[in-house]
Amino acid sequence: MPIFSTRVLTYLRCIFRLFIGLTLLLTLVGCDFYTPSSQLEQIRQRGEIRVGTIYGPTSYYQRDDTAQGFDYELAQSYADWLGVKLTIVPVYSTAELVELLRKGKLDLAAAAIVVTPERRQLFRFGPGFYQVSPKLVYRNGSPKPKDIGDLKGNIVVPAGSTGEDLLKELAKQYPNLKWSTNRDADVEELLKQVADGKIDYTVVQDTVLARTQRYYPELTEGMTLAKNQTVAWAMTKLPDDSLYASIIDFFGQRFMDGAIAKLDEKYFGHVQNFDFVDTRTFLQRAKSLLPKYQDLFKTHANVVDWRLLAAISYQESHWDPEARSYTGVRGMMMLTEPTAKAMGVNNRLHPEESIKGGARYLEQMMEKVPASVPDDEKVWFALTAYNIGYGHMMDARRLTKELGKNPDAWSDVKEVLPLLQQSRWHRKVRYGYARGGEARNYVNNVRQYYQSLLWLDNEQQKAHRREELDDDDSSEPPSAERPTVIAEVVKQITLR
């Protein structure tokens, strides 16, 4: 065959191959699987959303081997709304969280993150859903700080925290302001150091302080460093708006259906009106008196947590089996004589009989609460009935509805309860006058004592686990656990 013909054939083969290649390429470009999917579609395709948060008393913590926290529950609600699994990535500081988000290891961050101009340059924020005010905290008994620019003592904040960012801003106005950062301690640890007198001051959000004072009553608010800072979820800035739009939609619905208000009530609705002496006395008695009766509470708490039953008993009698009141109530659970008879209690001053009778009475109140009330709020309605009677509790619900509020939401009903003391309102209800304001305070106090008992019990369990590790001659000190956990979580994310 002539050389010319061979070259032509070779050339034609090349053209044909090029044509086939271009055709395949154009076909691929037109295929759906080649088109990059949106961020939200990617989350749904992999069936999980990765949410970063921070260990702490408001955002995320483990209690009784169960995850809890305002931000955790809200993130779980969002994952359920999307129909995907929630993969929570907990860290110990804002700096760690920001770094994971910046590197794209998270879909979003939910950890009481304050929106600042500097952070807006780095991240996109969802809608604000509550506000906080950072506080300078000091130890009760120490001189109260008066001037942020002339403090005597050391301020320590977690490295990379909102507190550090705020101090940097304040330093522009107060050149003498000095502080130090700690990369190995989180907010709660620094609060404990203030309570123990190891450091003079730290800076925390008011919501964190209010909850932590129930465990460390020595903590005292020194001054407000800023007001009404907005908290929101943060996500990476991308041209793709799908995740952002979804979050906007989610929050809009949750504001409308009252879910966020319900969470706010659950975690922050009972932490106002801190009393140093009362809290300190309670913690002392929880350590000295409660162990004597703990097994009785565990035995007879059938429908509620035994620690809640113990909290009710403390509110009633301060765990005094011989407690008496001028109104005629007696014993650990301060039962009236008719109630005691109805519950089969022969001796109200006998600790076990009183606890058993009080638990039975609470069970009856729980069963009578209308089914329309959410299960996790029924106990607060039952406690109101326990305190002022079932009829008055129902009056408060009816009045709540008449005022255009939700009679099934404790956050609404507790605001209406004090109206039962006002003639303008108690004339309109079936059972008349009631000490509604006292009932509201009663429930709030029980909730505060309950939270403190949960914390104490959790601390005891942690101490017990540490003792078991020591007995096993663990070579790694407890302080080394933290970075290992974080490193392992980050490693797992990276391997995905």
Swiss-Prot record:
Please give the SUPFAM superfamilies that the UniProt record associates with this protein. Lysozyme-like (SSF53955), Periplasmic binding protein-like II (SSF53850)
Q: Where is this region: LT domain?
A: 273-496
One Pfam short name:
SBP_bac_3
Active site: residue positions:
E316
Q: Where in the cell is it found?
A: Cell outer membrane
**Which segments carry the region annotation Disordered?**
464-486
Q: A cellular component term (GO) from this record? A: cell outer membrane
The Gene Ontology biological process terms listed for this entry are: cell wall macromolecule catabolic process; cell wall organization; peptidoglycan catabolic process
Where primarily located?
membrane
User: By its UniProt entry, which InterPro entries does this protein fall under?
Assistant: Lysozyme-like_dom_sf, MltF, Solute-binding_3/MltF_N, Transglyc_AS, Transglycosylase_SLT_dom_1
Among Gene3D superfamilies, the record links this protein to: 1.10.530.10, Periplasmic binding protein-like II
Reaction(s) catalysed by this chain, per the record, are: Exolytic cleavage of the (1->4)-beta-glycosidic linkage between N-acetylmuramic acid (MurNAc) and N-acetylglucosamine (GlcNAc) residues in peptidoglycan, from either the reducing or the non-reducing ends of the peptidoglycan chains, with concomitant formation of a 1,6-anhydrobond in the MurNAc residue
Q: Where is this region: Non-LT domain?
A: 32-271
Organism domain of life? Bacteria
State the EC number(s): 4.2.2.n1
Which terms are listed as keywords in the entry? Cell outer membrane, Cell wall biogenesis/degradation, Lyase, Membrane, Signal
Q: Where is the signal peptide?
A: 1-31
Please give the PROSITE patterns that the UniProt record associates with this protein: PROKAR_LIPOPROTEIN, TRANSGLYCOSYLASE
Q: How does it sit in the membrane?
A: Peripheral membrane protein
Tell me a Gene Ontology molecular-function term this record carries.
peptidoglycan lytic transglycosylase activity
| Summary of the function given for this chain in its UniProt record | Murein-degrading enzyme that degrades murein glycan strands and insoluble, high-molecular weight murein sacculi, with the concomitant formation of a 1,6-anhydromuramoyl product. Lytic transglycosylases (LTs) play an integral role in the metabolism of the peptidoglycan (PG) sacculus. Their lytic action creates space within the PG sacculus to allow for its expansion as well as for the insertion of various structures such as secretion systems and flagella.
Q: Which PANTHER family match?
A: MEMBRANE-BOUND LYTIC MUREIN TRANSGLYCOSYLASE F
Q: Which NCBIfam families match?
A: PRK10859.1
Instruction: Quote the entry's note on domains.
Output: The N-terminal domain does not have lytic activity and probably modulates enzymatic activity. The C-terminal domain is the catalytic active domain.
State the similarity comment.
In the N-terminal section; belongs to the bacterial solute-binding protein 3 family. In the C-terminal section; belongs to the transglycosylase Slt family.
Q: What is this protein called?
A: Membrane-bound lytic murein transglycosylase F
What is the organism of origin for this protein? Aeromonas hydrophila subsp. hydrophila (strain ATCC 7966 / DSM 30187 / BCRC 13018 / CCUG 14551 / JCM 1027 / KCTC 2358 / NCIMB 9240 / NCTC 8049)
